[in-house]
Amino acid sequence: MESEIFDYFRASNMISKKAIHIPPFIVMDVMEKAAEMERKGENIIHLEVGEPDFDTPACVKEAAIKAFRDGKTHYTHSLGLIELREAICEHYFEKYNVKISPDQVLVTSGSSPAMLLLFSALLNPGDEIILPNPSYSCYSKLIEFVDGKPVWVGVSEEDGFQYLPEKIVEKITKRTKGIIFNSPSNPTGNILSAERMREIAGLGPLIISDEIYHGLVYKDREHTILEFTDMAFVFNGFSKLYAMTGWRLGYTIVPDEFIRPLQKIHQNFFISANAFVQWAGIAALKETKEEVAKMKEIYNERRKFMISRLREIGFGITVEPTGAFYVLANAGKFSGDSYRLAFDILENAKVGVTPGIDFGSNGEGYIRFSYANSLENISEAMDRIADYLEI
């Protein structure tokens, strides 16, 4: 009897089906493999992860230290500090001329929890979210984790990786709860035009706009979905623009009627975001204009250099990315298996890159390169890849 009980309680029987079946985040597998190689003495250049190589601006660190020393280390309101929520509203008004209330803002420990909260509040089993293929890997996994259904709309290199309203409308059903997009996009670096965003906003279902790369645009300008509709959800945060990935601070902006359901889930799952980090977020919004402009200038220099070198090596780039800090390059000349190619490049050229398959089936045959690294390291990485591919 004891043996039967022991067998039943083996880990293989106790782990939930959701935990068993959730796919890995491949870019993290690449990064962790690279870290393992580094521990063995290998010199790896990281172009796989979307993490700024810049240090967090000094004023942000100073604000966090001051808050910490002032004893601001306790729970905050579950929606977040009112001072931070007001600063977020001011930011959206100054940049986009849209008016939102602090009562529509929920501050979270990074934008990923905001996604989990929204999908948990929005989706019943079998409800659908339409999303571009390729797109950020975790969207579909979070949707499926709460028993929703991701419905893919293919975007292609031939169309400049644009999310086309005429293709989206074909996927709308009675179960469609929302349409999600990310502009500037991860992994493509493309930007949706105001006209296209307006068309998508008019399609009917709720719109979910991931605006985490706003501010990192090198031509034209980005738009918030809130310029075109009030019935939209926004994800945003501090990781990318302000070089604060390790701080874990994000937020979501939602229509009035949705804030209480999200707040209740947040209270139960997370209670509140870190208090002194929220004070640092206020400084990021109000005091980093010069630092952000300098980082953006450097990113743009790297962007142009990387595009040029990748083309020389033989990677295809039909439309130049003009936002975020990624280049999604066609690797068809070298391999149709992006997963194998990415790990071959890591093993042989000692450069971390992300396989396009991590972002959906339409990403297969592509490699995503991040230029969130120094120009010197990017140059060395391009040389290593060219040598490995015998260019």
Protein language model features and the residues they cover:
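A general structural signal for alpha-helical elements within enzymatic catalytic domains
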Residues: 35, 69, 89, 93, ...
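PLP-dependent class I/II
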Residues: 2-15, 21-25, 30, 37-43, ...
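Glycine-rich phosphate-binding segment of PLP-dependent enzymes
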Residues: 56-76, 89
